A protein has these predicted regions:
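Short, acidic/polar
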Residues: 22-35, 79-96, 114, 137-143
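Acidic-and-aromatic substrate-binding clefts and catalytic sites of carbohydrate-active enzymes
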Residues: 22-25, 45-53, 77-82, 108-113, ...
């Protein structure tokens, strides 16, 4: 598996297993299967409503936590500093982990600046190993990066 080194030195698998549109009921089984065939990055999001299934599968897998790279994303209804801060802790609880490897802002809407401040704080506290954004166009990314202390380490984009 190819590894990418992020700007802060965190190593991330280049390829991962995404659980978008995987029902909460099926998520644990699907992630367990993905881990059993060698996937070591699992990509979920608050909006997918299946973080708990990811957490259960990783916990039950017997694979050391530091060998599984977990990505999640804060949904726009949780933007703003306080809501984002609370939602990060909720994701940690659902994923049954003390840290998330990469946490992203899911979309460039609403109070993304407040939400990103919450990411920065959780990153400094060690709750998040890396932070970034998802689905940001270049102008959104440049604007955000110009107004924060910790630059986004990832801009995850959907391609077909």
């Amino acid at each position: 598996m190819k590894i990418i080194k992020l700007s802060n030195g965190v190593e991330m698998p280049q390829l991962g297993y995404g659980v978008y549109q995987v029902t909460p009921e099926e998520c644990e089984r699907c992630v367990s299967d993905a881990l059993s065939v060698g996937y070591r990055m699992i990509d979920t999001a608050q909006a997918y409503h299946n973080e708990e299934g990811v957490g259960r599968a990783v916990k039950k897998s017997g694979i050391a936590r530091d060998e599984v790279f977990i990505v999640s994303k804060i949904w726009i209804s949780n933007y703003g500093y306080e809501k984002a801060k609370t939602s990060i802790d909720e994701s940690l609880r659902k994923l049954q982990t003390e840290y998330i490897d990469l946490m992203l802002l899911h979309q460039p809407f609403c109070d993304r600046y407040g939400a990103y401040r919450a990411l920065e704080e959780a990153y400094r506290e060690g709750k998040l190993r890396a932070i970034g954004v998802s689905n940001f166009y270049p102008d959104h990314l440049i604007d955000l990066a110009s107004n924060v202390d910790v630059k986004p380490m990832v801009n995850q984009v959907e391609t077909h």
